[in-house]
Design a protein with these regions (language model features):
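Gram-negative bacterial Sec-dependent N-terminal signal peptides
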Residues: 2-22
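Sequence/structural signature of beta-propeller domains
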Residues: 23-645
Length: 645
């Protein structure tokens, strides 16, 4: 009997302990229920079975679009009356993007066909209709879809159940719309939804239990992935259903039994709205004419709630997004370099004086050597001579060669020389060692009959060298003529041969100009003529080139920090304009970004480049993602975009 009483007491204490431990949670749940929102109205649906909704305006009327596991997509009016349905397919996720007036682009994942499908939602004589545009098979179910507008293009982000994301440009062709792949994105499992804020250019991804991520939507920028909202901010384990109210600047989402809203520009302020819903765990929530609408998973009921919603943030009214820089489409590209990672660096252009269309592009692979390309971007020749960084060339008078190219070599510190024949053959003339720890930047120029080169050490000093031809074809030497001390790292440089002026870029400082003759005479020092300001020039200042065309001559500079290219007057004293190199869908070319080196020529290279050619290193080679390469841009397109004519 005593033993039985002992067990009874032990069980009683254990249960009491459990109840005591659960007490705070039960108390919190009771408080939550007492404050939970009750629906003011219920919108009944007919055999929809939906887990996502979104509001839209069409033909002057207000509608809700719903994903349907039974009927694909269903459109209902403000009262819940059904207006159209696909009546086929199993859809849990869709993305919605406004196009022209009364036109919406819809991307949906159909589980029955395992396809990403594009449709156009519009009206025909005032009656809503939905039309098929295109479909693309997928290898895994898609769990998150969201659209982005970039440079008047429509981009689609699609993330599958394993966390592998893809960015596409979706665009019309003659017969149907196309999905053009831009890049992959990697998140890991349990992604639940995504949204894009086009004003800030941020892609937002919900990934329970890690939180909500924010990263750059533009593939030509670093991801800069950071936490938009941590799990503690969300107060729930199962969160998602991201929906952006662009008018107010609030990001709405669901978490367990709650609906939350965050200021898109100030997530650190915490949730601007957080309310539990009575007897409901929503998976999709939106605002609609001052009301909150919510939907449970696989539901046939939309709940309406009368509740005070957060007002548009004051800063949202003034926010206009990042400075828009004009864009010029890429005209061509070279094949990717063989080395992975940060490899391609600096180009030079050899103009064939007899047949300009047979000119060459020399490009460094700073992990292996020098690549030679034709103007179609095909690889003509490779020289595996070491880690070449910067390359430049000039024409010469010589018995065999019509031009000499020089490149800094960081494997065995020195300068590698190359000769170019009149027929376009490139020969390696060997390495000339330098008393320099790490040769980095380089630019070649002519001083009368002499061939000169400036070479920078990564630690800061810049040497002036003369390239002296010898008796034989490869018997060349370097003679040091002067030393220029600079305070920080210099890579990009170019010389105006006619004016005998050196321009060089201090990566985080700006553009400097030096009168070479006066410097050699001891009467001049470099002048800072264009400091880094974050807009016209954003650090790092990298590649430089001179476009020579009389009074239409320009200094062209790579502004790496904002992925743009700045034009200055020939003397560098005045800013003329800037541009980005953009996607060319007609040629299936991506743009360029994170550019190190560049070169430009005003020669006419034929119908594709009648006013000259700009070649830039592309640090992020997309469409599809590959190793780095060089992009080619027609100067005629640059001149038209910046009104240089």
């Amino acid at each position: 009997m005593a033993l039985k009483h002992f067990f009874y007491s032990a069980v009683t204490l254990a249960v009491a302990g459990l109840l005591s431990a659960c007490g705070p949670q039960i108390e919190r749940d009771n408080v939550r229920k007492s404050d939970a929102l009750s629906p003011s109205q219920e919108m009944a649906l007919s055999n929809v079975v939906s887990s996502q909704l979104a509001p839209l305006t069409l033909g002057g009327g207000d509608y809700l679009l719903l994903a349907s596991e039974k009927r694909g997509l269903v459109l209902v009016d403000a009262e819940g009356a059904e207006k159209l349905a696909l009546d086929g397919g199993k859809v849990e996720r869709f993305a919605l993007q406004a196009l022209a007036e009364d036109q919406w682009l819809v991307a949906a994942y159909d589980e029955d066909s395992a396809e990403l499908q594009l449709r156009l939602l519009d009206t025909d004589q005032g009656v809503p209709r939905i039309r098929y545009l295109a479909a693309m098979p997928t290898s895994a179910p898609q769990v998150a879809l969201c659209f982005s507008r970039q440079a008047e293009r429509t981009h689609l982000f699609a993330i599958d159940e394993s966390g592998l994301g893809q960015e596409y440009v979706v665009h019309p062709r003659e017969q149907a719309w196309e999905f053009t792949g831009v890049r992959p994105l990697y998140f890991g499992e349990q992604v639940s939804s995504c949204a894009v804020d086009d004003r800030s250019g941020k892609l937002l991804v919900a990934q329970p239990p890690l939180g909500i991520w924010s990263l750059n939507a533009d593939a030509e920028m670093d991801e800069e992935r950071e936490v938009f909202a941590a799990p503690a901010d969300l107060d729930g384990k199962a969160f998602g259903g991201l929906w952006l109210d662009r008018a107010s600047g609030n990001l709405w989402l669901t978490a367990d039994d709650k609906v939350l809203a965050f200021n898109i520009n100030a997530p650190a302020q915490g949730a601007q709205f957080k309310r539990a819903l009575l007897n409901m765990e929503p998976v999709s929530a939106v605002t609609y004419h001052g009301q909150l609408l919510a939907l449970a998973e696989e539901s046939d009921r939309v709940q309406r709630y009368q509740v005070e919603l957060p007002q548009p943030a004051a800063e949202m009214q003034a926010f206009r997004g990042p400075l828009e820089i004009p864009r010029v489409r890429a005209s061509g590209q070279t094949v990717p370099v063989q080395s992975g990672g940060d490899a391609a660096d600096d180009p030079a252009i050899w103009v064939n004086p007899v047949n300009p269309s047979a000119s060459l592009i020399l490009g460094t692979d700073k992990k292996s050597g020098l690549n030679v390309y034709n103007l179609k971007g095909a690889l003509v020749e490779q020289f595996a001579v070491g880690r070449l960084n910067n390359v430049d060339l000039r024409p010469i008078q010589h018995g065999k060669f019509v031009a000499i190219a020089a490149a800094t070599n960081r494997t065995d510190p020195g300068v590698s020389l190359f000769g170019i024949t009149g027929g376009g053959e490139v020969e390696h003339l060997g390495l000339r060692n330098l008393d320099m720890e790490d040769p980095y930047g380089l630019c070649v120029y002519r001083k009368g009959a002499d061939l000169m080169t400036w070479v920078s050490d990564k630690e800061g000093n810049v040497q002036l060298l003369q390239i002296v031809p010898g008796q034989g074809d490869i018997d060349w030497t370097l003679k040091k003529r002067a030393n220029l001390h600079v305070s920080s790292q210099v890579e990009g440089c170019v010389v105006d041969d006619e004016m005998q002026t050196l321009f060089f870029g201090e990566e985080d400082g700006g553009i400097w100009r030096l009168d070479i003759a006066a410097f050699l005479a001891g009467t001049a020092e470099p002048q800072l003529i264009a400091p880094v300001d974050g807009e016209r020039l954003a650090a790092d200042v990298e590649g430089m080139g001179l476009y020579h065309a009389g009074d239409k001559s320009y200094l062209v500079v790579s502004s790496q920090g904002n992925n743009s290219y700045a034009l200055f007057t020939r003397d560098g004293s005045q800013f003329v304009g800037h541009f980005k190199v953009d996607i060319n869908l007609d040629k299936n070319l991506d743009g360029s970004s994170e550019t190190d080196g560049l070169e430009v020529s005003s020669a006419s290279f034929g119908s594709e480049y009648p006013q000259g050619l700009l070649v830039v290193q592309d640090g992020r080679n997309r469409m599809p993602s590959q190793t780095q390469n060089f992009k080619l841009v027609s100067w005629a397109d640059i001149a038209e975009t910046l009104n240089l004519q």
